[in-house]
Amino acid sequence: MRYTVALTGGIGSGKSTVADAFADLGITVIDADIIARQMVEPGQPALNAIAEHFGSELIAADGTLRRRALRERIFSHPEEKAWLNALLHPLIQQETQQQFQQATSPYVLWVVPLLVENRLYQKANRVLVVDVMPETQLIRTMQRDDVTREHVEHILAAQATREARLAVADDVIDNNGAPDAIASDVARLHASYLKLASQFVSQEKP
């Protein structure tokens, strides 16, 4: 298994910005959210199963999934959320493993929004948390997704707390300030991860 740095953070924390900065340095990025979206693209078996289970009104005229409608449908129905997870999780896991096998960089950045909730930090060699104040998360997400404050507060309440994420962190990027600061933080961490990955490889050799 390649040396793995798991990247996590709450909604609106700036995970994608940080992941893009690592990708610019030539690091393979495996993003759980992107894989999950790919699983429900038109023509994918999972999308057909969702349409059958929830009804064709969840499919837009262009054949794509109406994500917001699905989120609203499962938000207050735990049994429907469980059904969706049972459908998607094995597919996501399979695709994730395949991407790990195809990775070519010295280490892999594995972006997992629900790293703490699903205890997936146990599968990584190191955990990097993008940290922001809850109020910043609210404002950024409201602007980005064009949703109400109440909607974002519901999502935040369902996610792991800031304290729970920081408790499993080996490294932290503070993203409360200007986005320009991220590049220097990522460059510093990248140098450190290259050393750790190199040590990991030498330890693994018989």
Swiss-Prot record:
Keywords carried by this UniProt record: ATP-binding, Coenzyme A biosynthesis, Cytoplasm, Kinase, Nucleotide-binding, Transferase
Pathway: Cofactor biosynthesis; coenzyme A biosynthesis; CoA from (R)-pantothenate: step 5/5
InterPro entries cross-referenced by the UniProt entry: Depp_CoAkinase, P-loop_NTPase
Catalytic activity, reaction form: 3'-dephospho-CoA + ATP = ADP + CoA + H(+)
Location relative to the cell: Cytoplasm
MF GO annotations: ATP binding; dephospho-CoA kinase activity
Enzyme Commission number(s) of this protein: 2.7.1.24
Keyword Nucleotide-binding: yes
Gene Ontology cellular-component terms listed: cytoplasm
Binding site residues for ATP: G12, S13, G14, K15, S16, T17
Domain DPCK, first and last residues per copy: 4-200
Chief place of localization: cytoplasm
GO biological process, one term: coenzyme A biosynthetic process
Assigned protein family: Belongs to the CoaE family.
NCBIfam families noted in UniProt: dephospho-CoA kinase
Function text: Catalyzes the phosphorylation of the 3'-hydroxyl group of dephosphocoenzyme A to form coenzyme A.
Name under which the protein is recorded: Dephospho-CoA kinase
Organism taxonomic ancestry: Bacteria, Pseudomonadati, Pseudomonadota, Gammaproteobacteria, Enterobacterales
